[in-house]
Amino acid sequence: MLSAVAKPRQLASQILNFGLILSTAFMIWKGLSVVSDSSSPIVVVLSGSMEPAFQRGDLLFLWNRNLLQETDVGEIVVYNVRGKDIPIVHRIVRKFGTGPHAKLLTKGDNNAGDDTDLYAQGQDYLERKDIVGSVVGYVPFVGYVTILLTEHPWLKKVMLGLMGVLVVLQRE
C-alpha cells in the first residue's frame, strides 16, 4: 500500500526536478543575455572559416557592451544576416567611418574573400546594430555536441530515449 502512494510522489518529484533544471538553465541564459547585452551570449562555431583561430565546434562567449569604445578592425565578431538565423563568426577587416553608423566589412580568417556575398541582398556592409557580440573567450570543441545533434537528427531521438529510460529506472 505504501509503495502505491510513493510512486506518484516519486514521479511528481522527478517532474518537479526536471522543471527546476529547465527553469534554472533558462534563467542562466537570460541572465547572461542581460549582462552581455547580447541576444546570444554563447554561440558554437559551425564551420572552419575562422581556422586557425577557432575550430568547428568551439564554444564562444560574446560581449556586446562596447559603450566607451568602438568596434575595431581585427576584432572577431558574431553577426546575423538579415533574413537568416545562422550566426556568422568572422573578423572585421575594414571599417569606414566612426560611431554607431560606421560601415564594417568582415572576412573569415580561412576564406579567400570578404563576406559581401554572405550579406543580405542590397547590403554591402554591416553596421554596429548587425553585430550580436564580440568574442571575449572560448572553450574548444565543447559545442560539437550541438553540431552532432543538428547534423544527425536520429541522435536526438536516441539521447531522449536514453534519458527517458534513465528517469523511469531511477530509484531514490
Swiss-Prot record:
The chain crosses the membrane at residues 15-35. GO terms for cellular component: signal peptidase complex. It is an enzyme of class 3 (hydrolase). Residues 158-169 are annotated as: C-terminal short (CTS) helix. The active site is at 49 (charge relay system), 90 (charge relay system), 115 (charge relay system). PANTHER family: SIGNAL PEPTIDASE COMPLEX CATALYTIC SUBUNIT SEC11. GO terms for molecular function: serine-type endopeptidase activity. Its main location: endoplasmic reticulum. This is Signal peptidase complex catalytic subunit SEC11. It comes from the Eukaryota. It catalyses: Cleavage of hydrophobic, N-terminal signal or leader sequences from secreted and periplasmic proteins. Component of the signal peptidase complex (SPC) composed of a catalytic subunit SEC11 and three accessory subunits SPC1, SPC2 and SPC3. The complex induces a local thinning of the ER membrane which is used to measure the length of the signal peptide (SP) h-region of protein substrates. This ensures the selectivity of the complex towards h-regions shorter than 18-20 amino acids. SPC associates with the translocon complex. It comes from Grosmannia clavigera (strain kw1407 / UAMH 11150). Catalytic component of the signal peptidase complex (SPC) which catalyzes the cleavage of N-terminal signal sequences from nascent proteins as they are translocated into the lumen of the endoplasmic reticulum. Specifically cleaves N-terminal signal peptides that contain a hydrophobic alpha-helix (h-region) shorter than 18-20 amino acids. Keywords: Endoplasmic reticulum, Hydrolase, Membrane, Protease, Signal-anchor, Transmembrane, Transmembrane helix. Its EC number is 3.4.21.89. The keyword Transmembrane applies.
